[in-house]
Amino acid sequence: MTIRLSDEARQLIAVFETETDATAVDCLPDDDRVVYVVTAGEMGAAIGDGGSRVDALEATLGRSVVLVEDAPTAEGFVANALSPAAVYNVTVSENDTTVAYAEVAHEDKGVAIGADGTNIETAKELAARHFDIDDIQLT
């Protein structure tokens, strides 16, 4: 699937890759935060010792930074997008629409949803961009 990046997203990815020595495959900029999809296996490099690289990136951008690890499957990607919530299982159902059903620990549903639904909406947008998933439902 081809992902279209805005000029701002391309610039933010360039800053990310310079600051972290990790590779980002997607970026969702917002007024107060930037969400990066990091190549699978590069999260440690992106975070840095004790979060040092993320802290430096946040200082450079003046916004909070959220990292999501890429995954080869829709199920893995949805689980990563809902992190740090404990996701036990993800099932993708394809009928008229494609829906990912994520089994999340009861005590982590608030984390998966986020303040004002921010986390779940971001996960839905990323899942749509990367795997043509129309919706994510928490179970």
Swiss-Prot record:
Residues 31-97 form the KH domain. It comes from the Archaea. SUPFAM superfamilies: Prokaryotic type KH domain (KH-domain type II) (SSF54814). InterPro entries: KH_dom-like_a/b, KH_dom_NusA-like, KH_sf_prok-type, NusA_arc, NusA_bac. GO terms for biological process: DNA-templated transcription termination; transcription antitermination. Pfam families: KH_5. Gene3D superfamilies: 3.30.300.20. One of its GO terms (cellular component) is cytosol. GO terms for molecular function: RNA binding. Keywords: Cytoplasm, RNA-binding, Transcription, Transcription regulation, Transcription termination. It is found in: Cytoplasm. The keyword Lipid metabolism does not apply. Belongs to the NusA family. Participates in transcription termination. This is Probable transcription termination protein NusA. It comes from Halobacterium salinarum (strain ATCC 700922 / JCM 11081 / NRC-1). The gene is nusA.
